[in-house]
Design a protein with these regions (language model features):
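Structured catalytic-domain cores with a bias toward divalent-metal coordination
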Residues: 1-214
Length: 214
């Protein structure tokens, strides 16, 4: 199957301009399980975007071979508002310059409207309950009237993610700890050499300056 793309246009806050969010879908629309992945809601945290960039061709190939059982939605660059915020040569993508809000705060709370829709209908079938609650959450989001660009972004992303079985919101930091990944057998089987396997792994980690061994 071909990759499916969707473009969400945000309301313009400046005459003559507008921003968009690109959404990529793999697998069968509406199929389960549904996985939603977004990156760079803090817009200067770009490793998540890079991770999804490298994931895309693998998903495209898997989709062509019919290997994706459910639906996978990627939003590699979820925050075009923050992407545009440059101060001199510095990228300031964590807070919205207009409202001073952290981009990853103040998501839309639909718990009350959902509760009002479903509390008399909850039954003993867990799967039916989940389906009903997801439907009510989407209805509540569709009833929202966002007042500005940032609110629109939040509502639209929650529409994509609120009924997902798995949600991955990719972040990073300005510092990355160096990890050493080793196979289980390399760690527990031995001895190999004077240190044994565990000792050899620890010695290698020390030589490399590794901070975490997995």
């Amino acid at each position: 199957m071909a990759i499916k793309t969707k473009t969400i246009q945000l309301p313009s806050m400046t005459p003559g301009t507008h921003r968009t969010v690109s959404v990529l879908s793999f697998g069968k629309s509406g199929a389960r399980p549904k996985v939603y992945m977004q990156a760079a809601i803090h817009a200067n945290e770009m490793p998540g975007t890079m991770a999804l960039h490298h994931l895309m061709p693998m998903l495209t190939e898997a989709d062509k071979k019919g290997l994706i059982q459910g639906e996978i939605i990627l939003v590699p660059t979820v925050n075009p508002i923050g992407q545009s915020q440059l101060v001199g040569n510095s990228h300031a993508g964590r807070y919205n310059h207009l409202s001073n809000e952290n981009f990853n705060r103040n998501w839309i709370d639909v718990s009350e409207p959902v509760a009002q829709k479903v509390w008399k209908k909850i039954g003993t079938n867990p799967e039916a309950n989940v389906k009903m609650i997801r439907k009510a959450a989407l209805e509540a989001l569709n009833e929202m009237k966002p007042a500005n660009e940032l609110q629109t972004l939040r509502v639209e992303m929650q529409k994509l993610s609120t009924d997902a079985d798995y949600v991955l919101d990719l972040h990073c930091d300005i510092y990355a700890a160096l990890h050493l990944f080793t196979a289980h057998n390399d760690w527990v089987k031995g001895p190999t050499g004077p240190l044994g396997n565990e000792g050899a792994v620890k010695a290698l980690a020390a030589d490399l300056g590794v901070e975490a061994t997995m």
